[in-house]
């Protein structure tokens, strides 16, 4: 991984973010299996905003860990009722991560 520019790693993890949060749905989860257009639009805008930002990472592991945490929080939002207390809690955690992060 040291031979690849950090920008490639960042781009890769941004594509993983889109894949895991937007393109994949969990058919076994009652909430994620059926996603209304309003929620899809909301989540897509959030993901695109994250992907539009430039980040600074010291190394590949930092980049990977950051995006894995972002993906996890967004997936937890996908499993929560839209705009519920649980959903908003995950959103706040994500906001904190993004503001404290890179």
Locate each region found by the language model.
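Conserved catalytic/coupling modules of large nucleotide/cofactor-utilizing molecular machines
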Residues: 1-102
């Amino acid at each position: 991984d040291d031979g690849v520019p950090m920008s490639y790693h960042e781009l890769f993890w941004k594509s993983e973010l889109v894949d895991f949060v937007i393109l994949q749905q969990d058919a076994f989860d009652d909430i994620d299996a059926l996603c209304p257009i309003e929620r899809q639009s909301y989540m897509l805008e959030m993901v695109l905003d994250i992907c539009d930002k430039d980040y600074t990472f010291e190394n590949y592991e930092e980049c990977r860990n950051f995006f894995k945490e972002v993906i996890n929080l967004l997936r937890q939002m996908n499993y929560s009722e839209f705009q519920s207390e649980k959903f908003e809690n995950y959103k706040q955690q994500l906001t904190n991560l993004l503001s404290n992060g890179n």
